[in-house]
């Protein structure tokens, strides 16, 4: 599966104005509250870097979970993501990168990931809002740090005091060889970029 995307940065002082504009222009919003756990490959020789594109990420929607439940991570539905590097030399176009996603339903997620050859790296929480434009998703969010490891009990801490909001616009195409679908997806991203140009400069940032 291919993800076509654009990214932008919204200063905290402009958040409310941007959200008001998004709510008038797009369908939504839907609240985002997700817990992400990142794993890196084990046994990488010291002289070689652990490339982020080879890392594995687990995601769970924690909005409906009881924040006092210390066993939530064993009972929740996890999705697993493997994301590749975005294509180079597309500065004036949208970014494109391969994304593989699978739902994990049975057994210990941690044991499963470790048996695949990964070890824990770090974790974070994404909190924000999600909008929709045809087949395109528009997310505005902040990345937060939980107060304790694997805890969903607030407060969550921003990574810095002046942390901006990230505007992530994306769509997925199942088959990259389907040029009609790829062109349609890129056209929809261009429409969203034009719609949001008054308050955010969306760009292709290499991931």
From Swiss-Prot:
Coiled coil: none annotated. Pfam families: Med18. It is found in: Nucleus. Disulfide bonds: none annotated. One of its GO terms (biological process) is positive regulation of transcription initiation by RNA polymerase II. GO terms for cellular component: core mediator complex; mediator complex; nucleus. Gene3D superfamilies: Hypothetical Protein Pfu-838710-001. Keywords: Activator, Nucleus, Transcription, Transcription regulation. InterPro entries: Mediator_Med18. Its main location: nucleus. Signal peptide: none annotated. Component of the Mediator complex, a coactivator involved in the regulated transcription of nearly all RNA polymerase II-dependent genes. Mediator functions as a bridge to convey information from gene-specific regulatory proteins to the basal RNA polymerase II transcription machinery. Mediator is recruited to promoters by direct interactions with regulatory proteins and serves as a scaffold for the assembly of a functional preinitiation complex with RNA polymerase II and the general transcription factors. Component of the Mediator complex. Interacts with med17, prk1 and rbp1. Belongs to the Mediator complex subunit 18 family. This is Mediator of RNA polymerase II transcription subunit 18. It comes from Schizosaccharomyces pombe (strain 972 / ATCC 24843) (Fission yeast).
């Amino acid at each position: 599966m291919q993800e076509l995307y654009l990214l932008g940065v919204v200063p905290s002082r402009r958040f409310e104005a941007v959200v008001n504009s998004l709510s008038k222009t797009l369908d939504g919003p839907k609240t985002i509250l997700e817990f992400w756990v990142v794993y890196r490959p084990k046994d990488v020789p010291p002289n070689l870097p652990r490339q982020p594109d080879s890392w594995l990420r687990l995601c769970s929607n924690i909005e409906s979970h009881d924040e006092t439940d210390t066993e939530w991570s064993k009972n929740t539905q996890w999705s697993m993501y493997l994301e590749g590097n975005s294509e180079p030399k597309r500065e004036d176009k949208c970014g494109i990168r391969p994304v593989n996603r699978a739902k994990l339903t049975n057994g210990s997620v941690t044991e499963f990931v470790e048996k695949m050859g990964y070890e824990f790296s770090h974790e974070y929480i994404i909190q924000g809002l999600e909008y929709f434009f045809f087949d395109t998703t528009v997310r505005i969010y902040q990345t937060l740090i939980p107060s304790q490891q694997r805890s969903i009990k607030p407060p969550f801490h921003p990574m810095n005091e002046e942390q901006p909001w990230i505007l992530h616009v994306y769509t997925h195409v199942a088959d990259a060889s389907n040029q009609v679908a790829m062109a349609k997806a890129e056209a929809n991203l261009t429409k969203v970029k034009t719609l949001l140009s008054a308050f955010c400069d969306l760009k292709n940032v290499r991931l």
